[in-house]
């Protein structure tokens, strides 16, 4: 599969990107969810957390848990963050999951989201594909750039990309678990996520 693209709560910016990706037929070979009211698209049971019924997913909780198979069966995460405003960067468990899974990622989030990640010591994939969407302050134009990027990514040689980014992805994984290194920048969300990982609540 191409993308892993998970959407839970319906938000305007998520609906806009989802519709654009569907209109461009970019999700045809992807694993994705979208919780619309009339026709929710859910994960196949084999990709869901153990003990979870995809048709009765809890509205709250379970967001910090992670299961490995969806990341193994896809090459790139489209991270659908909580908001896309241009005045603050708000990171949630949605970005830490692909980092923990050593997955390549594209982020639909705030203006300068990737820049903030870099300030925290992480690396992104600007040497391998266009990340100029992060510099686009207008949310609608940012979506345009993400859609264009996703179309380009579907044509990439992913075996080469994963070989070339192995050290980068390992660096991000190590950085995520280096609490001392991140002590000045880390936010409450990743600390909570690490508590789940350390206590064995992260499913594999």
Which residue stretches match the model-derived regions?
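Pol beta-like nucleotidyltransferase catalytic core
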Residues: 1-79, 85-92, 96-204
